[in-house]
């Protein structure tokens, strides 16, 4: 509330981050591994706090992926990754539609006040039922589609994507250390 009061209803521009040297190397290595060498699977190993979620965002952008699945082991990591991706998408003026496949409806609530002012209208859907997810996936859009899910909800997204005859351009699977 303090941020909103100081802003007097005016949203401050969100800053688009630039990759740091280690992130630039990771992006370059991903391009070489997946695009140049045409590998279908790979690993990006980076320490905690080094910006893996942000690097994943930049890799997806570099690949020009339009249908992205981001799978993580916990609800907390969905929320953290969603905040990073949503913030940078707004900062870079990207047209994105979002859905979270998990059991916690509060995951879509962006908690960072600086970001929440501009992201409150993103309309982030939270679903667990494959039929609802499939219906959402079937809606065609020119926007980039990003699906966040926990591994625990993986079966729901697998069932939904099969039902919707929907395939992803890029899958990012994160681990917690």
Feature-to-residue mapping (PLM):
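ATP-dependent helicase/translocase motor core
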Residues: 1-47, 54-66, 116-121, 142, ...
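ATP-binding Walker
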Residues: 48-51, 76
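Conserved Walker A/P-loop ATP-binding site and its immediately adjacent core
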Residues: 55-58, 62-111, 151-155
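Conserved catalytic network of the ASCE P-loop NTPase/AAA+ motor domain
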Residues: 62-63, 138-142, 162-166
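Loop/turn-to-beta-strand initiation segments
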Residues: 67, 142-146, 167-170
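Conserved helicase ATPase core of P-loop NTP-dependent helicases/translocases
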Residues: 127-139
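Conserved two-lobed SF2 helicase motor
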Residues: 140-159
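SF2 helicase catalytic motif II
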Residues: 151-153, 163-177
């Amino acid at each position: 509330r303090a941020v909103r009061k100081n802003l007097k209803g005016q949203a401050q521009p969100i800053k688009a981050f630039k990759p740091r040297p280690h992130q630039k190397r990771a992006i370059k290595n991903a391009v070489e591994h997946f695009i140049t060498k045409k590998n279908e699977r790979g690993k990006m190993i980076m320490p905690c706090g080094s910006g893996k979620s942000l690097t994943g965002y930049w890799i997806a952008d570099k690949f020009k992926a339009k249908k992205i699945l981001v799978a993580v082991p916990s609800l907390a990591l969905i929320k953290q990754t969603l905040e990073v991706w949503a913030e940078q998408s707004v900062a870079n003026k990207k047209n994105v539609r979002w859905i979270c496949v998990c059991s916690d409806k509060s995951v879509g609530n962006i908690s960072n006040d600086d970001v929440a002012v501009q992201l409150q209208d993103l309309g982030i859907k939270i679903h667990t039922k494959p039929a609802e997810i499939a219906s959402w996936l079937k809606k065609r859009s020119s926007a980039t589609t990003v699906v966040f899910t926990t591994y625990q909800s993986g079966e729901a997204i697998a069932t939904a994507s099969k039902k919707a005859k929907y395939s992803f351009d890029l899958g990012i699977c994160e681990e917690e250390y």
